[in-house]
Amino acid sequence: RADAAPTVSIFPPSSEQLTSGGASVVCFLNNFYPKDINVKWKIDGSERQNGVLNSWTDQDSKDSTYSMSSTLTLTKDEYERHNSYTCEATHKTSTSPIVKSFNRNEC
């Protein structure tokens, strides 16, 4: 099949989760091909590697693309110490990364 660029979306922690003292930021990367993809997290512009869990779904039976999620897990205190959260996906379909981000103070 032809190469396909991922559709990338980012989600801040839910208010319910923050109430319980945790904070997970999730980045979804959907319907890309081939499977090789690189995901980078940045907090206030600095790359973050701790606390990241990547999970792939099985290859889609209809269109043979791949999807994955990348979850950045923090404590509520740590989450609230920073403002800018960014997920960067690097895939062969684009020379520059696909970047999705949000600012905590705008959620």
Curated annotation (Swiss-Prot):
The keyword ATP-binding does not apply. One of its GO terms (biological process) is B cell differentiation. Keywords: Disulfide bond, Immunoglobulin domain. Disulfide bonds join C27-C87. Residues 6-103 form the Ig-like domain. GO terms for cellular component: extracellular region; plasma membrane. Pfam families: C1-set. PROSITE patterns: IG_LIKE, IG_MHC. It comes from the Eukaryota. This is Immunoglobulin kappa constant. It comes from Mus musculus. The lineage of its organism: Eukaryota, Metazoa, Chordata, Craniata, Vertebrata.
